[in-house]
Structure formats: structure tokens, C-alpha cells
Amino acid sequence: LENAWLETENGRVVDFGPMDTLPSGHADLVVDGSGRVLMPAFADSHTHIVFARWRESEFVDRIGGLSYEEIAQKGGGILNSALALADADPIRLLDDAYARVEAMMAQGTAALEIKSGYGLSEASELKMLRVIRQIKERAPIPVKASFLGAHAVPLAYKNDRVGYINLLIDRILPQIAAEGLADYMDVFCDRGFFTVPETDRLLEAGWKYGLRPKIHANELDFSGGVQIGVQHNALSVDHLECMGEAEIQALLGTETMPTLLPGTAFFLGLHPPPARTLIDSGLGVALASDYNPGSSPSGSMPFVLSLGCVLLKMKPIETFAAATMNAAYALELQSELGTLSPGKRAALVLSRPVSSPDFLCYAYTEPWIERVELGRSLPSS
């Protein structure tokens, strides 16, 4: 809609329309949008932003030729983050993670999901989820928590996978439910991590406590993660670098949102997920940052838009929908966010003057955000 107005009141969208229908009357604040793009703020439905330290040494290892899996096999990767988190002070974890949330909000993110998964022990997983609960209480935006104890098998259980899965199901899940610490259940269902039968057992256990699945699937191989996710009515299946006709057919007609994480493919040099094939097959897709210290150290949703175009061959308008409306669905927030609709939250991003909406994806390092509204205004620096 070109040459338009939008009215908000008390943090909600009231109405919008062409300028020749602008209602007369007093407004407390008028913002000039001439030559600018106004769009819904982003929802980031897949992040790992509670962590104890960055992993730039692994970045150098990968430049030297090691793969993500090889780094993990020598004790790096997720296990590296788990060792650091075990000794981390919860207050420091909270302060560092909340600083990341503030930076993400300044770049237009108005809702996000945060996963555990760098704990890999009862004490550390619960510590992470309690930190996420504190972020929920502090943040002026909706935050959802996912329990990802099945992110990797910790070294202490290297020769006892069943024992670790039993720990997750019999000890940690009941405590999570007792404290109300999670909204979703996640499993890394992929080669070298958790198998389909293991994922099946874990997701079934999560459902017993009301935790709907949102799972990692098909990042490294045709793992069967998509199919088992759909079988358990997962809210989303995420990554999806390895997708074929069987996976597409499994998703069509379901309530499961395929969620693509182009930042990970970019940073790890992976073959990107086949977004064009998914979209042309009739599937909607969501885009998310996968913000984490090992494989996607960025929470910039504007950059994700650009990667959606450059890596995934999505059209700019498709990336806008994927990062707003579809991503809100992947957080069960579609009634509150994702579109500029009367009654919804007035979570908005206003660009600087630009030549067209396509510019927002094209100029991939340009600081194009002029104003963010999340119930309050934040600087975009």
C-alpha cells in the first residue's frame, strides 16, 4: 500500500488506509513516513542467545579446514558451550543475554524464542531455563522458551545414550513442568546427534507435559527429522538444508512451519536450504536468525532478509512475510504480531528514506532502520 497512513493507540494498531482517507482530528504524535517503508516488526523464532562465551577459536579452526562435525567430535561445538555454561554465574548469563535481546530489539525484533541446550546436565539446563524466564519477565516483547536438553549427548554419558535420554525424560522434564520453565520441546534430530527413534521418545515425553515440539531437523543429512516432527504435530521444523520430495510431501497440508536459518548456512558454508523449491511447492516458510556462538553469531534480522534473497533465492516480499507473519506463526503469536492489522500489537519498523522496499534486502550492511516501535521507541544504533 503506497502513500498511506497508520494509526496506533495504547500500543495497538487502530486502523490504516490511503492518505486520502486519513481521519481528521488530534494526534498526540505524528511521524512522517514520506519516502519510507513501514512494516511489521520481526519475530525471531529460533535463537540460542543464553551462552557463557563466544567460540571464535572454532571459527579459525573451520577456516583451517575442520568441519562443524569434526570440531564437535574433538570436544568443541555444543560441548564447548556446555563446559563454559556449567561454571557460569546466572547473573552474568542474564546480563549478557539481555544485552543481546536489546540489540535485537533495536534491529526490529519484536518477539523471539530462546532455547536451552548448552547445559546438558540437570543443573545447567535448569539454570539456562531460569535465566530465560527472567528475560521473559524483563523484556518488553514476547519471549518463548524451548527445552533443548537433547542438543547433544554430554561427555559424561558418551557411552550411555539411553541413560542421558532417561535423565531428560524422568528428571529434568518433570522439574521444568513443575516450574513452568518451557513452552516448547526441541531435539537435534540429525546425523551424529539424536536418531529418529530417540527423537520420537523425547517428543512423546514432552507432549505429556504440554510441550509442543519445535525441532532441529535435516541440517546435516536426510535425517528423518522432518517426518518425525510432522508426526508429532511440531509447530516448526528448523534448518532443512537437506530436503527432498518426501520431506516436502510430509509437510504439505500440515500445521508445521518450515523454518529456514540462512545465517547458519552462510557462516558454516553449508548448502543452503531449498527455499525456492519449498515455496514453489506451496509451502510457507519462516526465516529466523539461529543466533548462537558457534554457527550463527548474529541476531540481525535485516541481515537474514538479505541472506534470504542472496542465498535462498527468495524474493524480497517473500522474505518480509517469512520474517514477520510466518515467523509469528512459528511462535504461536500470529494473533498478536506479524501483520499491520487493527487490534494487533503496534510492533513496527520504519525505514529511513529508501527508493523501494527491495532496497531493504539489497543494501545488506546499510543501517536502514530509522525507528522501531515495540510499545516504546528504541534507537537503531
Model region roles, listed by residue range:
Residues 28-32, 145, 371:
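Conserved beta-strand scaffold positions in the cores of enzyme catalytic domains, especially
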Residues 79-96, 102, 110-223:
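Metal-coordinating catalytic core of metallo-dependent amide/deamination hydrolases
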Residues 212-213, 222-339, 351-353, 378-379:
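Active-site-adjacent C-terminal substructures of enzyme catalytic domains
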Residues 325, 345-381:
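C-terminal cap of metal-dependent C-N hydrolases
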Residues 107, 179-180, 209, 232, ...:
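Structural motif
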Residues 6, 11, 35, 46, ...:
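Divalent metal-coordination and catalytic microenvironments
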